[in-house]
């Protein structure tokens, strides 16, 4: 385990990871320039992704930028939770040891879970509205402006 860790998280590996993050960030934003989906939206007073430019592109953005991360993280959390439950039922630690280690072990898991829930709550409304309008464009006029604006904030 330690040899893999030392290889993956070396100085050169870290530089590669930072470079990969920048390449992925540019790869995520460049299609907007070709589709022409960056527009000034007077409802939110900002230059943002215009969901009405291309239905297919909006569907792809919602799938790759929202549902795919939600699906992957949900799968990982399910696997982690099953593993934690299986280990907890297999090993019966001493009560004193249990009280010392359990809060520290579960604290990191709960913190990551809260971050995941916040991601879903913050980005969910905007992406669900965008996906709904992309699938059925006439519905876009019936969405109240306050709901659209609230989904951005």
UniProtKB/Swiss-Prot annotation:
The entry's localization annotation reads: Cell membrane
Membrane side Extracellular: which residues? 34-57, 134-145
Q: Where are the transmembrane segments?
A: 13-33, 58-78, 113-133, 146-153
Q: Does the keyword Membrane apply?
A: yes
Which is one GO molecular function term here?
melatonin receptor activity
| Membrane as UniProt keyword | yes
Q: Which loops or segments lie on the Cytoplasmic side of the membrane, by the record?
A: 1-12, 79-112
Bilayer topology term: Multi-pass membrane protein
Kindly list the biological process annotations in GO that this record carries: G protein-coupled receptor signaling pathway
Q: Which UniProt keywords apply?
A: Cell membrane, G-protein coupled receptor, Membrane, Receptor, Transducer, Transmembrane, Transmembrane helix
Might you report a single GO cellular component term?
plasma membrane
* UniProt function note: High affinity receptor for melatonin. The activity of this receptor is mediated by pertussis toxin sensitive G proteins that inhibits adenylate cyclase activity.
Q: Of which family is this protein a member?
A: Belongs to the G-protein coupled receptor 1 family.
| Protein name per Swiss-Prot or TrEMBL | Melatonin receptor type 1A X2.0
Organism from which the protein derives? Xenopus laevis
